């Protein structure tokens, strides 16, 4: 978000690309469209069928690498067709390159990460975004839906849809910064310890909403964050 703002603020010829796949919840596309509208930015939505890749759906430890390859090759092709020669992404200095297979895909495809290259951390980006008046400045970090499914467990369209619905239900009840992870056919809810009392207050409603899609609903007492 901030990278797009900065590019436009300093007069760069830029176009935003949003990859729409089964791994992204609907609200992410809504937020991207809102941001593009507020910045008067040109944004192109590119559909990518990540579930068509057996390597990705097998969910190996380096799934993110293969998925990033699919995503960024699609963006690169679109950008080249649009007359662009440089592709930038929003990775920042807080992202651990040594622990992310997806980073390898970025390097191999020559995708540049200006925020990271300039040493801007996640906190720096939030503060700069706040100063710029971007609504995304305090938006909780959100990893793709595939991260909710244990490594080695095949990823299916049904599991992704169930996960998205479960997290949407919890969000509608006022919970924030949480994850609903699959453990077998059960749901494990991870959220900050401070929100646990509220979750127990809504216990019956949560069971009614999530129960039909899962064999069980668990609360991770270790909390999140």
Predicted regions, residues:
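Short, conserved charged micro-motifs
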Residues: 195-202
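Short, structured loop/turn "capping" segments at alpha-beta junctions
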Residues: 121-122, 126-127, 134-143, 176-178
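Short, aliphatic-rich beta-strand segments
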Residues: 180-193
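Short amphipathic alpha-helix segments
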Residues: 157-178, 204
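Internal, active-site/partner-interface "lid" segment
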Residues: 139-159
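Catalytic cores of large soluble enzymes that bind and process phosphate-bearing ligands
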Residues: 63, 67, 155-158, 162
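ATP-dependent adenylation/nucleotidyltransferase module used to activate substrates
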Residues: 1-131, 172, 187, 205-214, ...
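C-terminal boundary motif of the adenylate-forming
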Residues: 174-183, 220-224
